[in-house]
Each structure stands twice: as C-alpha cells, then as structure tokens.
Amino acid sequence: MARRPSTDDLRSGPERFMALVKTTVPPVHPAGLPFIGASLALAAAGRRNRWVRGAGLVAAGANAAFFRHPPRVPPTRPGVVVAPADGLICLVEDAEPPAELNLPARPVPRVSIFLSIFDAHVQRIPISGEVVAVEHRPGLFGSAELAAASEDNERNSVVIRTDTGAQVIAVQIAGLVARRIVCDLTTGDKVTIGDTYGLIRYGSRLDTYLPEGTDIQVLPGQRAVGGETILAELP
C-alpha cells in the first residue's frame, strides 16, 4: 500500500537541500582524495594566475568524477552474477583462468568489461561468498580494450566460492594509462554481492570467469552497471 508523505518528506531548508545533494552527487572513493587535494593545492598556490588556478580546479573536478563511488542496489535473486564494474562489455568468450591461480587449464565462460576514463573505476563483488584466493601478477601496460590484455597486462585475480561451491573469478587488469591496481581483499574474507573491493586508476578492464554451464545474460557492445547489471546465472 502506498504511504502518505509525512511532514519530514516535505520539509525544506538546509536539511532538505543537503539530502538532495547526497542522493544526487556520488561520494568519492578514499583513494581519490590525495589526487583531489593535490589539484586543489595547485589551484590555491596559483590563485593569482588564472591559468594555473583554472587548471587546478579542472583537475580537481576531473579526479572527483573519476574516483566517484556511486551507491548501487544489487539484485537479491540467488545464483546471479553481477558486473564487477561499470563499462562496455567488449568480449564474451571461453578462456582458461589465469595460470597463477593453479586451476584446471580448461576453457570456461569469460565476460570482459572495458572501463574508459569516463567510467566509475571502483570494482564490486560479483557474487556473495568467501574469498579463497587472491593473486597479483606483474605484467605489461598495453591498451586494456585489446584481447591480449587478459594475458599480457598486469592483473590481480580474486576467486570467490559461493555457498553452493561454485567458483567465480574477478580479474582486475591494468591498462595503458592505469598503472595502479588496488584490491582490499584477502583470503578468507566473507564478501557480499555489490560491495566495493578495489579500483584501478585511469582506464582498465575487468574479466569475470564463470563456471561451465553458466547462462550468460549479456552481449558484446552492451553497457554494464557495476553491482547491478546481471552478467550471468549460475547453473
């Protein structure tokens, strides 16, 4: 049944304004604060020079947009895997999991998402479960939208085991500009679908490896919303 608006719903003034701001302007991930602070410091130091001041303010705004951390509402249906990041689905194919995970070397479904510099670059848990492996592998910094990036570029792999025993692998891949992978997970962590677990700075890619028999729900060229778009349903 619909609820009648209360007095609190209709209030105006500073409290209402701040509530609107909080629901409209996404917060910033803590990893972005040093970059925003440095940009504002540049603007303050060059306040007598409009070009320097302007460059500092533009850089601060760009960093705030890049490191934005928008709230997301993941689906509650059991057995679904959500996109671990915002971006463009660039590949849907079968591929072997990263070798450093020491998993069986047989192809499984893989969905790749390319993140441009205009996407939110926080990464989100694709499915609830327990982290059973976290492996970082150094590599190159080629363009993340190329197929070879999955094999050649620096990457960080996280294996999540669900309550049913299925394993889903989320792989953060550095790109041409992205040179810093941040992952807050360790083996043994209990994780919840849609929660933030890391980021990659300035353009990157996310590969999601799925169990055999998984029903893929997306196609190349589709845009994904991290934490909300359903990539697949587990068998």
Swiss-Prot record:
InterPro entries: PS_Dcarbxylase, PSD-A. It is found in: Cell membrane. One of its GO terms (biological process) is phosphatidylethanolamine biosynthetic process. It catalyses: a 1,2-diacyl-sn-glycero-3-phospho-L-serine + H(+) = a 1,2-diacyl-sn-glycero-3-phosphoethanolamine + CO2. Is synthesized initially as an inactive proenzyme. Formation of the active enzyme involves a self-maturation process in which the active site pyruvoyl group is generated from an internal serine residue via an autocatalytic post-translational modification. Two non-identical subunits are generated from the proenzyme in this reaction, and the pyruvate is formed at the N-terminus of the alpha chain, which is derived from the carboxyl end of the proenzyme. It is an enzyme of class 4 (lyase). The keyword Membrane applies. GO terms for cellular component: plasma membrane. GO terms for molecular function: phosphatidylserine decarboxylase activity. Coiled coil: none annotated. Its EC number is 4.1.1.65. The keyword Cell membrane applies. It is a peripheral membrane protein. Keywords: Cell membrane, Decarboxylase, Lipid biosynthesis, Lipid metabolism, Lyase, Membrane, Phospholipid biosynthesis, Phospholipid metabolism, Pyruvate, Zymogen. Pathway: Phospholipid metabolism; phosphatidylethanolamine biosynthesis; phosphatidylethanolamine from CDP-diacylglycerol: step 2/2. The modification Pyruvic acid (Ser) is found at S204. Binds 1 pyruvoyl group covalently per subunit. Its cofactor is pyruvate. The active site is at S204. The record marks G203, S204 as: Cleavage (non-hydrolytic). PANTHER family: ARCHAETIDYLSERINE DECARBOXYLASE PROENZYME-RELATED. Belongs to the phosphatidylserine decarboxylase family. PSD-A subfamily. Catalyzes the formation of phosphatidylethanolamine (PtdEtn) from phosphatidylserine (PtdSer). Heterodimer of a large membrane-associated beta subunit and a small pyruvoyl-containing alpha subunit. This is Phosphatidylserine decarboxylase proenzyme. The gene is psd.
